[in-house]
């Protein structure tokens, strides 16, 4: 199954799981127009971040690509320092410097492997991490942070799923079907655990701690 289709099903099953919980708790699902636009902005960043990641896998080995994705704590810190005036310590500066050097070595430039494809992959993966960092930094400053975490996460992933569906339709012309029972089970678990549960708890964390701390802790799990 193509990775874009996997993402769509992942978000779809995650939304179904969250919708079931919302219906169980009889949560009011109405959205004000302003809140809809704010959620759509977050969904767009999340969807484009996901697209950049899966496209980046076409240009680099999956291990290197995943490592580059985890540049997002560095992006989160830099955005917080520049725009939110967070204090930048010497230790943090050294950590950022080491991370930048690591990305430089992973790009393959020193080995003579810095081809256009490799640089394209590097750009896509750093873009993915950057957009995820922007998502984490701006959310705590938005009015929708007062919305129940489960409801907010549902709408973010619902609109992201629609964006990915449009992307798959225009780029591939179709969404791959689920062929086997094992695929169905795996996709459901993928939607439940690393999508629904993980991102609801992320939203809850961003309401309690700084974006930088959430990004650093998130990189360890």
Regions found by a protein language model. Name each.
Residues 3, 15-18, 76-78, 114-172:
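Transmembrane alpha-helical segments that form core, pore/gating elements
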Residues 5-16, 46, 54-87, 92, ...:
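Specific alpha-helical transmembrane segments that line the substrate/conduction pathway
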Residues 8-9, 65-71, 138-161, 195-221:
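Helix-helix packing/entry segments at the starts of transmembrane helices
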Residues 12, 19, 43, 47-51, ...:
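Hydrophobic/small/kink-forming positions within alpha-helical transmembrane segments
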Residues 13-32, 101-115, 159-183:
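Membrane-interface helix-cap regions at the ends of transmembrane helices
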Residues 18, 40, 46, 79, ...:
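Hydrophobic transmembrane alpha-helices of multi-pass small-molecule transport proteins
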Residues 25-69, 105, 190-209:
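Specific transmembrane alpha-helical segments of multi-pass solute transporters/efflux pumps
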Residues 33-34, 69, 85-105, 115-122, ...:
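Loop-to-transmembrane alpha-helix entry segments
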């Amino acid at each position: 199954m193509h990775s874009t289709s996997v993402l769509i099903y992942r978000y779809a099953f995650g939304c179904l799981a969250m919708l079931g919980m919302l219906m169980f708790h009889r949560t009011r699902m109405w959205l004000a127009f302003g809140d809809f636009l704010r959620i759509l902005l977050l969904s767009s960043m999340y969807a484009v971040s996901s697209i950049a990641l899966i496209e980046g896998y076409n240009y680099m080995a999956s291990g290197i690509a995943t490592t580059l994705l985890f540049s997002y704590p560095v992006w989160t810190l830099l955005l917080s320092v520049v725009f939110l005036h967070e204090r930048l310590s010497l230790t943090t500066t050294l950590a950022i410097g080491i991370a930048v050097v690591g990305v430089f070595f992973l790009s393959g430039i020193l080995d003579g492997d810095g081809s256009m494809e490799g640089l394209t992959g590097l750009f896509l993966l750093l873009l993915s991490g950057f957009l995820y960092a922007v998502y984490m930094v701006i959310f705590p400053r938005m009015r929708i942070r007062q919305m129940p975490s489960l409801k907010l996460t549902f709408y973010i992933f619902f609109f992201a799923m629609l964006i990915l569906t449009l992307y798959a339709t225009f780029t591939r012309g179709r969404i791959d079907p689920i062929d086997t029972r094992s695929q169905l089970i795996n996709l459901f678990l993928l939607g439940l655990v690393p999508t629904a549960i993980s991102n609801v708890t992320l939203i809850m964390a961003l309401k309690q701690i700084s974006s930088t701390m959430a990004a650093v802790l998130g990189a360890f799990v």
